[in-house]
Amino acid sequence: MTVPSGYSGTPLPTKLGIRPGDRVLIDAAPPGFENDTLGELPDGVVLHRRAGRAPYDVVVVFRDDATTYRRHVERDIARTVAPAGRLWVAWPKRASGVLTDMSDDVVRRVGLQAGVVDTKVCAIDATWSGLMLVRRVRDR
């Protein structure tokens, strides 16, 4: 994987907190994400493209529409994310040229309403930003 100019040299799985043995769900990823962007995963990681037997340690959802995000966020948290797991919500950056009504503010606000807090932001690639949402410690 070539790291675009201006981007951290940190591998994306490390930025996303993917650890050896994690169960990872990728939902609605853009074409080429797994092969071209995600890169090599730590040993023992099981990658799923469809929700199956939950819970997952890391869930990465790609959303370019705030209505879809609002409609699915509680389901994404309740049904797929392990109690101490991480939900990454990715949205198109404004500079990407992709038409969207998503932003870090939308992700954060809707997440708070769903009972999760944001703890980390990540540049996924030149098009997508991501915000990590987790349950509060008292709610795990």
Segments (PLM) and residue ranges:
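A short glycine-rich, Lys/Arg-flanked "PGG" loop and its adjoining helix->strand segment in the class I
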Residues: R71-P83
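Conserved class I S-adenosyl-L-methionine
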Residues: L16, G21-A29
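Conserved Class I S-adenosyl-L-methionine
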Residues: D101-V121
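Conserved beta-strand signature within the Rossmann-like core of class I S-adenosyl-L-methionine
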Residues: V81-P92
